[in-house]
Amino acid sequence: MQYSIKQVLSKASDKLNKIGISSSQLEARILLRYVINKPIEYLLINLDEQLNEVEIEAFEKLLERRLKHEPIAYIIGIKEFYSREFIVNKHVLIPRADTEVLVDVCVHKSSLRATKRSVAISGILSKIASSTPMASSRNDEYTKILELGTGSGCIAISLLCELPNARVVATDISLDAIEVARNNALKYHVTDRIQIIHSNWFENLGKQKFDVIVSNPPYISTDEKPEMALETLNHEPYIALFAEEDGLQAYRIIAENAKKFLKPNGKIVLEIGFKQEEAVTQIFLSNGYNIESVYKDLQGHSRVILFSPINLNRSYARRIGKSLSGLQQNLLDNELPKYLFSKEKLIDEKRKIFLEIGFGMGEHFINQAKMNPDALFIGVEVYLNGVANVLKLASEQNITNFLLFPNNLDFILNDLPNNSLDGIYILFPDPWIKNKQKKKRIFNKERLKILQDKLKDNGNLVFASDIENYFYEAIELIEQNSNFKIMNKNNYLKPHDNYVITKYHQKAIKANRIPRFIILQHVSGDH
């Protein structure tokens, strides 16, 4: 018996509609198009054309699979992604439109809107790529990308098609998925620019370094199973969907291991699940990363986050006085990430906030935090031995109300909101005695203006020095600034509240240098 295209589509659409498939008409057309190898437009203008028995039987077999909630992409074996058709089967996750945001962020000048706490970025890979010649001119000059969990390879291959001078290493734990990815690489003629590795995350990468690490990792919690579509739950690979630890396990693995595989100034671009922005950003903040941008999908949900490691090497000052001990290195590796400063950690912060610039070995810094447990203390110090000592003292005394920025002051100033600090301590900074060096002083005219803007009205700034000329030059500088009032004009020898005599203070006394203190109050004015 023969039926027309119109009759076949109508009956199939009714059956699909009865099981809750909202796009029943479209899916019926897709299945029939696949059977007769004609475009959908052909079906729409030839509704009265008769189908033969072979065509109808083939169509009915495919329809029966769809009626059992098998995804249509698996039935026809292809799925469109980023304007290309990729081979898919039950061994790989079906590419989603939301994941195109991941590629978009990497490749294009994105029109996607970053969140208010983001710096608008675009064309991450394009910027890297444009700074280097094509790979054909020099084999070592190309953008090197790592994709973790490649699945069908749709992300990696899309990037290669969009970026001619990119090279990709793509990993997956599934050998079946790797076979699919290799077939897609063959289809789009990029086999010479992609290396597909059987690996559980970073395990088999050796010592390779990458400009960008990109991933759409498994991020669904098993608790979400009751809310999932049958097509996804019963047919797509479990390992590509679900992650332990409330869906966050993969992000923890990436955050803990990615730095050693990134080149200097490298980036991480990750897709996240619905409502996971806060949890994922906290994981990366705790492991020493900056959150550079958060991008939304077409539904307005946060979908892609751009991370970069906090750079501990961008500093003008000495970083290590003597070799770090095993304990010190362990503290820097394992404890410092928990306390690393980032601007995101100040969002919705209700406590009083104090900043100490150049805390040395940290005796004063830790004592202030201990004496004021309801406040937050931010410490800036380039001397890693001192940073490690703060972490040691904090651990011994169970002090947690602090953040550390082990870098040059200038790199943190833009991340401190104006009118946010209740107090600033600048105790015994390098005096830079020579005239040509004075511009390097922490306490100079330009920085004083910036610090003034960071202080709340009536906030305090404490400056101390054991170098007499530097101290009185600082007073002259302050007297030129009408936004500060000196609170201790009659006694510069008396320190501020909760001050502890540090080792440096003791050395100054022994060397017959007198420590002096200026206690300033910020007077109400424009910020």
Swiss-Prot record:
Pfam families found in the cross-reference section: Methyltransf_4 (PF02390), MTS (PF05175), PrmC_N (PF17827)
Enzyme class: transferase
Gene3D superfamilies: DNA helicase RuvA subunit, C-terminal domain, Vaccinia Virus protein VP39
Active site location: D430
Stretches the record annotates as RF MTase: 1-311
Stated role: Methylates the class 1 translation termination release factors RF1/PrfA and RF2/PrfB on the glutamine residue of the universally conserved GGQ motif. Catalyzes the formation of N(7)-methylguanine at position 46 (m7G46) in tRNA.
HAMAP family referenced in this protein's UniProt entry, alphabetically: RF_methyltr_PrmC, tRNA_methyltr_TrmB
Protein name in the entry: Bifunctional methyltransferase
Organism: Rickettsia felis (strain ATCC VR-1525 / URRWXCal2) (Rickettsia azadi)
